[in-house]
Amino acid sequence: MTMENKPAGQNGLTYAQAGVDIDAGNLMVEKIKPLVRSTRRPGADGEIGGFGGLFDLKAAGFKDPVLVAANDGVGTKLKIAIDADIHDTVGIDLVAMCVNDLVVQGAEPLFFLDYYATGKLSPDQGVAIVSGIAEGCRQAGCALIGGETAEMPGMYRDGDYDLAGFAVGAAERDRLLPRGDIAEGDIILGLASSGVHSNGFSLVRRIVELSGLGWKSQAPFQPGATLGEALLTPTRIYVKPLLAAIRACDGIKALAHITGGGFPDNIPRVLPKGLAAEIDLPAIAVPPVFSWLAKTGNVEPNEMLRTFNCGIGMIAVVNPAKVDEVIAALAAEGEKVVTLGRMTRREKDGVIYKGQLAL
């Protein structure tokens, strides 16, 4: 229809009328620029807003680097954040899920990008999310160099959103993990988790539903916090302590990030075919949240171990002669470390449990 024959009083449709507010997106970008600047590190000192993020690998000081990449999300933990209207911690989870997967390969996280998709963009909600992402990047020592904010009416309900993260790191070629000398008798150390982290939340939400509690209810397992606040405790980022321990002593042979699938699905991923991890379950100090979930949902111990981290967010396989040095290096960085078991010859399963989990 030409301008000449358009009916009088009829206005053309706009993108905003279709549900996409470009001005809101631009406002959010301006608000997050200081957050992005706070994550600068050697190799990344540019501004966001270009068509791509830049990183100078030479400035990061590597000599013979291998790039390592990972991407992940936060899963249905986001549903709790949305329903509880708490959005400033899930960004930490997003970074943690990616960078913890880098450090288990011996890599130092260098930069991070995020993808934030929503039905209707709220700049304040978006800024809260990015503030968490920036905090996660600072904890991991990586730069937030870009991202994508997608307002998609019709794809998501107003207020709903999803997140995805992308991290790239680097390791010197001769420092990659797992090492090839993992042997029977090597010691298994466990690093404490901060809580549920970012896996198993479909089961968590079902258990909360059965309990009859709401997200604003007092958390039965954490005095002084609501259930939403307690369950949204951010995933622990292990990057700086593990890199410090790797660099301080040549003792860590392998690392495993305990995510979905728990011990039985994650530990064997870093082990040679002929070896298994023997885990002393009574050595694990199980946080109260897991005991509450198990009892309230009547969840069997083996199901707990295959769904949740149960208090151990990271596993390290260590040279027996270096165990004390590794524990000291990790403790100096604030990590709670427990000796969990040892490597043994594999007969069937990649993980062998000894004793019972104290749920």
Curated annotation (Swiss-Prot):
<keyword id="KW-0658">Purine biosynthesis</keyword>
<dbReference type="GO" id="GO:0005524">
    <property type="term" value="F:ATP binding"/>
</dbReference>
<dbReference type="InterPro" id="IPR016188">
    <property type="entry name" value="PurM-like_N"/>
</dbReference>
<comment type="similarity">
    <text>Belongs to the AIR synthase family.</text>
</comment>
<dbReference type="InterPro" id="IPR036676">
    <property type="entry name" value="PurM-like_C_sf"/>
</dbReference>
<keyword id="KW-0436">Ligase</keyword>
<dbReference type="Pfam" id="PF00586">
    <property type="entry name" value="AIRS"/>
</dbReference>
<keyword id="KW-0547">Nucleotide-binding</keyword>
<dbReference type="InterPro" id="IPR004733">
    <property type="entry name" value="PurM_cligase"/>
</dbReference>
<protein>
    <recommendedName>
        <fullName>Phosphoribosylformylglycinamidine cyclo-ligase</fullName>
        <ecNumber>6.3.3.1</ecNumber>
    </recommendedName>
</protein>
<dbReference type="GO" id="GO:0005829">
    <property type="term" value="C:cytosol"/>
</dbReference>
<dbReference type="GO" id="GO:0006189">
    <property type="term" value="P:'de novo' IMP biosynthetic process"/>
</dbReference>
<dbReference type="InterPro" id="IPR010918">
    <property type="entry name" value="PurM-like_C_dom"/>
</dbReference>
<dbReference type="Pfam" id="PF02769">
    <property type="entry name" value="AIRS_C"/>
</dbReference>
<dbReference type="InterPro" id="IPR036921">
    <property type="entry name" value="PurM-like_N_sf"/>
</dbReference>
<keyword id="KW-0963">Cytoplasm</keyword>
<keyword id="KW-0067">ATP-binding</keyword>
<comment type="pathway">
    <text>Purine metabolism; IMP biosynthesis via de novo pathway; 5-amino-1-(5-phospho-D-ribosyl)imidazole from N(2)-formyl-N(1)-(5-phospho-D-ribosyl)glycinamide: step 2/2.</text>
</comment>
<dbReference type="GO" id="GO:0004641">
    <property type="term" value="F:phosphoribosylformylglycinamidine cyclo-ligase activity"/>
</dbReference>
<dbReference type="GO" id="GO:0004637">
    <property type="term" value="F:phosphoribosylamine-glycine ligase activity"/>
</dbReference>
<dbReference type="GO" id="GO:0046084">
    <property type="term" value="P:adenine biosynthetic process"/>
</dbReference>
